[in-house]
């Protein structure tokens, strides 16, 4: 058929582009995602289940039922006040709890850590579609490592999930700015 039966993804790049890249991958092919581990200087996952847990919470009730934003505080903490998100948006956050540590650059150590994020993310995206009928876009504010970015695009269901409006933090441009819109066809 000319299609590979398996793909391994070793991604490095700007987070918005990695989300877009993930959305272009076929979810009909078995795909593994890998993290470049800085301390150990390897792409190999550590053994075991890992300790990263993900807390999902609603941090702002918006005035418009179809305006939704999602903050991903994984590699670092994103504070609502730093985003410029308007009051009409309902805002949700997924935050990592890495044992006793707050969000940090080295939380993603095992494949299980990534799998738990993917479940939390998929559950929340589905919930947003149910709780905010008519939502066509989720405004996404990510502080996330590369494999998480790729899976954020990869795990969108074509013709089911809303588009992702991706924001990128850039201090030279005054904080978070819209970068691109990701659709999954």
Cite the ranges covered by each PLM segment.
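A short, acidic, amphipathic alpha-helical segment used as a generic capping/interface helix at domain edges
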Residues: 1, 113-134, 148-150
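Hydrophobic, ordered structural segments
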Residues: 2-44, 148-149
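Hydrophobic beta-strand segments of well-ordered beta-sheets in folded domains
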Residues: 3-10, 31, 66-70, 90-92, ...
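Structural motif
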Residues: 10-14, 71-76, 141-145, 169-170
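A short acidic (Asp/Glu
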Residues: 15-26, 80-84, 146-158, 176-178
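Long, charge-dense
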Residues: 29-57, 102-110, 163-164, 168-184
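Redox- and metal-dependent alpha/beta enzyme cores, enriched for Fe-S-associated oxidoreductases
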Residues: 50-123
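C-terminal structured domain segments
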Residues: 129-166
């Amino acid at each position: 058929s000319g299609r590979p039966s398996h793909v391994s993804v070793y991604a490095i790049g700007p987070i918005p582009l990695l989300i877009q890249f993930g959305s272009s991958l076929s979810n009909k092919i078995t795909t593994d995602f890998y993290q470049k581990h800085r301390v150990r200087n390897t792409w190999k996952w550590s053994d075991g289940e890992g300790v990263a847990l993900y807390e999902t919470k609603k941090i702002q009730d918006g005035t418009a039922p179809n305006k939704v934003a999602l903050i991903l505080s994984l590699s670092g903490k994103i504070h609502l006040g730093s985003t410029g998100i308007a009051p009409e948006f309902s805002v949700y956050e997924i935050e990592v709890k890495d044992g006793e540590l707050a969000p940090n650059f080295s939380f993603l150590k095992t494949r299980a850590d990534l799998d738990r994020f993917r479940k939390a993310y998929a559950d929340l995206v589905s919930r947003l579609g149910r709780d905010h009928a008519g939502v066509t876009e989720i405004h996404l504010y990510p502080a996330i490592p590369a494999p998480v970015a790729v899976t954020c695009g990869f795990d969108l269901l074509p013709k089911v999930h809303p588009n992702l409006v991706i924001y990128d933090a850039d201090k030279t441009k005054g904080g978070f700015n819209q970068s691109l819109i990701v659709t999954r066809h």
